[in-house]
Amino acid sequence: LAYEYAPEKRKGFFGSIPQAGVTIGMLMATFIVSLMTLFDEAQFLAWGWRIPFLLSSVLVFLGLWIRKDIDETPAFKQVKKSGQVAKAPLRDTLKHHWREVLIAAGLKVVETAPFYIFSTFVVSYATTTLSYQKSQALESVTLGALVATVMIPLMGLLSDKVGRQKMYTLSVVLLGLFIVPWFLLLDTGTGWGIMLATIVAFGILWAPVTAVLGTLCSEIFSANVRYTGITLGYQLGAALAGGTAPLIATGLLAKYDGDWRPVAVYLGVTVAISLLAIFCASRMKSAPDVASSRAARA
């Protein structure tokens, strides 16, 4: 929706705004948890635990209100007017656009696996394998999320000038190059080490990847199957490399006696998969279905 409603020269910026929802959610959750520390244990167990759920209900109603007043996008209305709406979008997407789905999934891999490594796995790794205090790890992740929240729309805006594919490719390469330094910084055992590692990896290098991902995937699919195609690609990539990432990383640490190098190799594989995906996406640039949809949007 953000992509299709956006002006032609601002699609990267508008497409990046929803992507910031993840880090904004992390910051909101951190704030709520911080408020809960104002209660003693008895108060929290008696009634305090209900407060986060009550506050989240406000977001539910806000989402329903927004959804209620959203109309179909101009691009989809044009498809509908021309009679090209897919009667069975899931079937048509899997039959005619399965390559695009795989590419979208591949693009998602390096966005989702490092996210969970840099924001979730790092807390466990820093406090169990290394000698950090839990507060140090959580503070570094919170600061990384804050930096990412600022960086995401800025990178989306920049992508409108330099191009989505160039920004994605450069960001993924830099992310891959920083994998080993990330572990080395953590191994210093210092507060500045974990803070710098998390801010650079999560806040600076991961941010442009997620900033352009939504717009990049939107440009792969034609308007009549765009929603279905992106959803399939996103969910497939997230299922393969999302929530499983901390489990795989923890399993590798356990198997290799705390050696971080196998985890670094695993992250390197996610980088390679997404670089292959962006290469394939660039080769599909002039595909008839994509080209025609772009012409229709022009």
Stretch-by-stretch model annotation:
Residues R10-T37, T231-A245:
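Glycine-rich segments within core transmembrane alpha-helices of 12-TM secondary carriers
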Residues L38-L54, G251-V269:
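A membrane-interface helix-boundary motif in multi-pass transporters
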Residues V22-R67:
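Helix-loop-helix hairpin linking two adjacent transmembrane segments in secondary transporters
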Residues K161-V173:
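Cytoplasmic membrane-interface "Motif A"-like loop-to-helix N-cap segments
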Residues V173-G189:
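C-terminal ends and interior cores of transmembrane alpha-helices
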Residues W98-V147, A241-P246:
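Extracytoplasmic gate region of multi-pass secondary transporters
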Residues G63-I70, L216, G268-R297:
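Multi-pass alpha-helical transporter architecture, strongest
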Residues I152-R164:
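Helix-to-loop junctions at the C-terminal end of transmembrane segments
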